[in-house]
Amino acid sequence: MIDKKFIGNLDLVRSNFKGSQIIVSTWEVQDNIKTNLMKNYEDVIFIFNKDIGSISKDIDGIKFVTNLNRMIVSTYNGLISSSKKISIKIRTDSYFYDKKIIYFLDEILRKNKLDNVDVISRMTKFCVFDRYVINCNLFARNPHSHLPFLFHPGDILFAGLTSDLLKLFEIPLSKPKIIEKRISLKNICYMRYSPEQYIWVECIKKINGGRYVFEGNFNYTSSDIVKSEIYYVNNFIPFDTKEIGFCWPKHSKHYFNKGRLSIYRRDDWINLYRKYVIHKPIEYSLGQRIRGLMITSMKIYFLIRNMLLRFRFVRRLTYRLFVKRG
């Protein structure tokens, strides 16, 4: 049976991007569903991949699951089928309600400008992509926040040159060892790399002489933080969902918009750009200072929380009640 929400999302994207090449890279379905989809949507390219399954592992009596490999396979196969120079990668449970993103793609890729930056400069040594990639900032973690994950772009939306997006997803599939307990004073997680981190770190590895630029969560130094920031500011530009007319309903309905204080905003990116690329003083607005105080309070909360999570029975109860991913 076809998901009605998916059909609604597909219709919205088609109406906002008329004349564009639309590719849906998904999993094998029954023949009658394939036939109906291709009959009703002759302007859409459907790719039905063989489902390679998820990765799972039991730790502390809890089963942890990641669909990382599914994302890699479906995204890569969709991108490799594109005949266009520019591509936008989104999830099938998300949609665009307008086409503002086209304006920003034109500004960045054709005019090489953004906001008040007339000509965007980059540090060649840290350029993984040929041009900047637009990154929806949901889950694009700021390592100075209360969720200090490095090399963590958001994986909900990428937009840029098709060749650059292919670089990001033309990587080896992950193995079960990616799931492991990682503990620090600041946080506890059960993945060496989150899906977002894995694709980015593996992508960088290809241009870094086969060496990992980052060894995994919570095992890092201040220089690793600097590298994470430099690689992000030279390859991605974060955009809020409203800026680009984009909606991923699951973030509010499933995650309850948690982590909003932990993600990169445009003013964060501008300050990284000033600090590393053009070497000018960082400027903090009143809003940024207020947000900094809120992040400090969240860090205190997480410190107390993580002290409690060191007890196994507390971890098991907490993850069963509250963890939404996997």
PLM feature segments, named:
Residues Q21-I22, F46, S87:
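Hydrophobic/aromatic residues located in beta-strands of well-ordered beta-sheets
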